[in-house]
């Protein structure tokens, strides 16, 4: 296996591209969607389930794992991979997005961000050095720098000031974790809100610091699709072509397709798992709201083309019954199915890019998932 951080480009189609990223726990074929395992678990699934659906990498959350059970405990017990029984690659976010989502419970300074725990109200400081230390304890394959995710609608003055802070924090993160240390990769994050020149400025500054990969943050925060695609189309090409590009927090099928078309390699989002728990399921015939009365006597499989256990074994009527009855099995089967759909969708996208027919594949999927879905 190549050294961690090796990024080998494969065939492309327009700006869409395939590649292979090597980490300490294996290689990842891109473009890739990363299921979110917030607290050391993808809700309702076992690691063997993730292997069965061919999940190539999962995401863990620094904020939640720091508060409970604690990063030092995880380190003492052998690191996050051993703790959760997953031997594939793991990316951990910096926890910044969760902290900034606390709004009134946090305060930003040059040193970092002070916040109150959502669990018990205790006060904590996330500095760049602290989030790096936490992620080193967790032992993730890819760690993210601390950044400020600017809220949608922030004015230019605030966005520009925040951009400078994010850059200074990125430098401190890099200093706290030198390139190549422990085989753990570190990705920088480009901010700049919805100002194209500030996005370009942020990209230049973050690239100058030097990271193993680069992420676009601050999108899918309340803006319209048109606004997101406009920024995405301009910002993605600013990121180095020879390093992985990561679009954070974006997961609707047509948004993944737009990201791939712009040259993005990695995506994460709670959408497929959260929607599963809400009874909204993705199929290759379109979206299914399993709680609808029309499925009460429907003996057909959820998706006859899907190889997941739920589709091979149960009817739509049974899946509806489980959901209406609030049975725990509903969450498990629905999650298993949705993540299988996303895994297959990305595999088909990679194949379409390799074969030079990505535009046709994108149009086919967008017809199934029109604007607003």
From Swiss-Prot:
One of its GO terms (molecular function) is tRNA-guanosine(34) queuine transglycosylase activity. Gene3D superfamilies: Queuine tRNA-ribosyltransferase-like. One of its GO terms (cellular component) is cytosol. It catalyses: 7-aminomethyl-7-carbaguanine + guanosine(34) in tRNA = 7-aminomethyl-7-carbaguanosine(34) in tRNA + guanine. Its cofactor is Zn(2+). It comes from the Bacteria. It is an enzyme of class 2 (transferase). The keyword Oxidoreductase does not apply. Pathway: tRNA modification; tRNA-queuosine biosynthesis. The keyword Zinc applies. Its EC number is 2.4.2.29. InterPro entries: ArchSynthase1/Queuine_TRR, TGT, TGT-like_sf, tRNA_ribo_trans-like. The active site is at residues 93, 268. One of its GO terms (biological process) is queuosine biosynthetic process. Binds 1 zinc ion per subunit. Zn(2+) binds at residues 306, 308, 311, 337. Keywords: Glycosyltransferase, Metal-binding, Queuosine biosynthesis, Transferase, tRNA processing, Zinc. Substrate binds at residues 93-97, 147, 191, 218. PANTHER family: QUEUINE TRNA-RIBOSYLTRANSFERASE (PTHR46499:SF1). Catalyzes the base-exchange of a guanine (G) residue with the queuine precursor 7-aminomethyl-7-deazaguanine (PreQ1) at position 34 (anticodon wobble position) in tRNAs with GU(N) anticodons (tRNA-Asp, -Asn, -His and -Tyr). Catalysis occurs through a double-displacement mechanism. The nucleophile active site attacks the C1' of nucleotide 34 to detach the guanine base from the RNA, forming a covalent enzyme-RNA intermediate. The proton acceptor active site deprotonates the incoming PreQ1, allowing a nucleophilic attack on the C1' of the ribose to form the product. Belongs to the queuine tRNA-ribosyltransferase family. Homodimer. Within each dimer, one monomer is responsible for RNA recognition and catalysis, while the other monomer binds to the replacement base PreQ1. This is Queuine tRNA-ribosyltransferase. The lineage of its organism: Bacteria, Pseudomonadati, Thermodesulfobacteriota, Desulfovibrionia, Desulfovibrionales. The gene is tgt.
